[in-house]
């Protein structure tokens, strides 16, 4: 059997893909999903909106929950309330989904599904509860399913000062965009 010529070996090496792993698998993609949390409230005759927080998904997608960290809600005084959030999308009872949704955001009745702030000084409850607080300076709002398409089209919720209040004090909007 004849040995291949050096020219033939050189040609073969240039045509074969490299065996060394590509760095493209190790680099972060140039774009990622970013979540925004906005609060809108009325103060006197003025309607105000502010971005409370943003959070990015992991570089290679939104496969795991994301958590907003922010210092306060603008429409609620810390220490004088127990902030509670209601979303229409996670209501299971028709009375909570279908009646006064624009006004109450899914919580016209006490039996509706509410996300009441849970005190979490050890930061261990964020996987169990949607809304937690360290009791001093920070609130944590967790999105358990960031891959769901509803977050692209903006999810609106209502913020209540207390879980027993009849009407919300502000509107929350959560959405994600590709940045």
From Swiss-Prot:
UniProt family annotation: Belongs to the gamma type-C retroviral envelope protein family. HERV class-I F(c)1 env subfamily.
Primary subcellular site in the record, as a coarse category: virion
Region (Truncated surface protein): 23-179
Keywords: ERV, Glycoprotein, Signal, Transposable element, Viral envelope protein, Virion
Glycosylation sites: 69
Organism: Gorilla gorilla gorilla (Western lowland gorilla)
Residues annotated as signal peptide: 1-22
Disulfide bridge map: none
Compartments (UniProt record): Virion
Coiled coil (residue ranges): none
Functional note: Retroviral envelope proteins mediate receptor recognition and membrane fusion during early infection. Endogenous envelope proteins may have kept, lost or modified their original function during evolution.
Protein name per Swiss-Prot or TrEMBL: Putative endogenous retrovirus group FC1 Env polyprotein
Note: Ortholog of the human HERV-F(c)1_Xq21.33 envelope protein.
């Amino acid at each position: 059997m004849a040995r291949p010529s050096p020219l033939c070996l050189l040609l073969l090496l240039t045509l074969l893909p490299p065996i060394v792993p590509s760095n493209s698998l190790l680099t972060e993609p140039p774009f990622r999903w970013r979540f925004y949390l906005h609060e809108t409230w009325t103060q006197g005759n003025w309607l105000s909106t502010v971005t409370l927080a943003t959070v990015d998904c992991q570089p290679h997608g939104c496969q795991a929950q994301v958590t907003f960290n922010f210092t306060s809600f603008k429409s609620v005084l810390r220490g004088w309330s127990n902030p509670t959030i209601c979303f229409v999308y996670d209501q299971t009872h028709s009375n909570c989904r279908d009646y006064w949704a624009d006004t109450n955001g899914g919580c016209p009745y006490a039996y509706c599904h509410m996300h009441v702030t849970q005190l979490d000084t050890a930061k261990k409850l964020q996987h169990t509860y949607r809304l937690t607080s360290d009791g001093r300076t920070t609130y944590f709002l967790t999105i358990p399913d960031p891959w769901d398409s509803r977050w692209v089209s903006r999810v609106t919720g209502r913020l209540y000062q207390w879980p027993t209040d009849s009407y919300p004090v502000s509107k929350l909007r959560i959405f994600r965009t590709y940045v």
